[in-house]
């Protein structure tokens, strides 16, 4: 069976780490599996895992592939737009530039206060009918050329729409706060009445293919089989919701050896693992950047009697954050489950995968959420007593963030030396390890595939 995994083209590891373990198990069982993600870090990890990564013939994808795969370079850009590849796929440079301009995304103002998947879709380009229509066409073409029997998606609404239009069986892997039955990312407050939404654009395209209208983008993520990450205790949904919980799905290469420096860690002093994810998503500062995680920890922990391991998930460490304090050790990447198990405390940006890593390994956390979806995750960790979070203060632009180092230092000491935090993390770990898992989830996908073939 040919299975295509699609994810939002985000240059970080969050969405990929929930897809790769399942994709690897499906491949091991004899299925042909491919991915679709043009971003730099996902491309690196997908290739390292031995999968093909298919790029739709869409100008924005090709440009993202170039810009997200390398540091911005005018010479490389010029070489690309005059390349044989552009001539072959778009009919030449002028045609490529025309299509790029015609199908450019229309985005709302950047903000760290993202209320829901529907709001996120509006902020990331889906207000433009030409963009959504052309992206959907390109993804439909890719699915057809790959001859996908099943599409497995992690947060790519247009890919879900393309699969529905083609009649492809659709499996979705989502967080509970992405489910249409949820209250979204900011579930502790009522949303304002005037949030941007792409529903008019989506429903116009759906109607042209004879599909039913939707009320919010989240409905596209409700697959023929909907798999919800986590467990009800950490990722609640209304009781009547039709969804299958699959526990923690986390990526770490099999049979990987610990880094050599693991043996140098002193067992008498606490180990703190700081994971920032992508410190800076674009050449300019954006409201969702995670450099605040590193910067605030440097200030708060430089004189603490702890061993700090700092990683960025294959991303570069911004020059302005160096030199690091003497008690810090920097590595671009470490095996996540292995590092979490060796750590006494995690400090991270609130990404769902990072939260799941701590809960699965029973390691308490201090979370510095860099935007609202991550604050949602942080609040769930706090609610089960497995950690605390501190939200950065921001200026009106949302780009300049700050944290009181004394407050962060006190929180780190509290979580590190309060037994109940570690006890609660271990309690949730036992619950989480008893639910779902990669093999069990793969069984469900195979059962679904067989049922659709009858």
Predicted regions and their residues:
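A short helix->loop->beta-strand "cap" motif at the edges of active sites that frequently abuts
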Residues: 167-169, 223, 363
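Short, flexible/disordered intra-domain loops and linkers
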Residues: 185-193, 282-290, 396-403
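Conserved nucleotide-diphosphate donor binding/catalytic pocket of glycan-assembly enzymes
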Residues: 170-197
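A nucleotide-sugar donor-handling region in carbohydrate enzymes
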Residues: 191-280, 314
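Short hydrophobic signal-anchor/transmembrane segments that target glycosyltransferases
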Residues: 288-305
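Glycosyltransferase specificity loop/lid
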Residues: 1-156, 160-162, 172-180, 309-342, ...
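Short, basic, glycine/proline-bearing loop/turn elements
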Residues: 5, 121-127, 143, 197-203, ...
